[in-house]
UniProtKB/Swiss-Prot annotation:
NCBIfam families cross-referenced by the UniProt entry: pth
Gene source species: Borreliella burgdorferi (strain ATCC 35210 / DSM 4680 / CIP 102532 / B31) (Borrelia burgdorferi)
Full protein name: Peptidyl-tRNA hydrolase
InterPro entries xrefs: Pept_tRNA_hydro, Pept_tRNA_hydro_CS, Pept_tRNA_hydro_sf
Site (Discriminates between blocked and unblocked aminoacyl-tRNA) residue list: N10
Gene this protein is translated from: pth
Subunit structure: Monomer.
GO BP field: protein quality control for misfolded or incompletely synthesized proteins; rescue of stalled ribosome
Any Pfam family: Pept_tRNA_hydro
Site positions (Stabilizes the basic form of H active site to accept a proton): D91
């Protein structure tokens, strides 16, 4: 089995290290931790790991998050993958900072990146990893997800990214349920 990990975020330095870009940040951690580098295609950057369980393709879209679906279906054919190989990594304001939720499939809720992907694929039958970015009821949601983390929050997230970078690269169909339990019970 192969795995295509799609980290959601917005391109550009102004969005770097914002709450909305935790998908990008996690993929950057996996890339650096494994001594890889990102290559550039027309609509995305990618890197590839070869694991015992199969290839792991890491993808960062060069489109804005709300247009993430525009990568499909061509990205599947570029890497000989299909929807069952897809794992989308994204932010979630309903989870506390440092908490994760790995799901085999689910709805699109209010996340525009998921909505875009599901609309193009005609299905929401793919895995996703939600990374909690906390919430601030005093600010509007758009301003909040586009805000940067403070130093204490970044320190916690770095520990989480380190943990997740080890856990995600060897996910397979055989161990998915165990990974769900381990990742979902973690808290950083």
């Amino acid at each position: 089995m192969g795995l295509l990990i799609l980290g959601l975020g917005n391109p550009g330095l102004e969005f770097s290290l914002t709450r909305h870009n935790v998908g990008f940040s996690l993929l950057d951690k996996i890339v650096s931790k494994n001594g890889l580098f990102l290559k550039r295609k027309k609509k995305y950057e990618y890197s590839e790991l070869k694991m015992i369980s199969g290839r792991v393709i890491l993808v960062k879209p060069l489109t804005y998050m709300n247009l993430s679906g525009s990568l499909f279906p061509s990205i599947f054919s570029d890497f000989y993958m299909c929807i069952k190989n897809l794992l989308v990594v994204l932010d979630n304001v309903d989870l506390p900072l440092g908490k994760c939720r790995l799901k085999e499939r689910g709805g699109v809720s209010t996340h525009n990146g998921l909505r875009s992907i599901s609309s193009v694929l005609g299905s929401s039958n793919y895995s996703r990893l939600y990374i909690g970015v906390g919430s601030n009821l005093m600010r509007d949601i758009k301003s909040f997800v586009l805000s940067r983390f403070c130093k204490d929050e970044m320190d916690r997230l770095e520990k989480l990214y380190d943990f997740l970078s080890d856990e995600l690269i060897d996910i397979s169909e055989a161990n998915f349920k165990n990974k769900v339990q381990k990742i979902n019970s973690s808290n950083f």
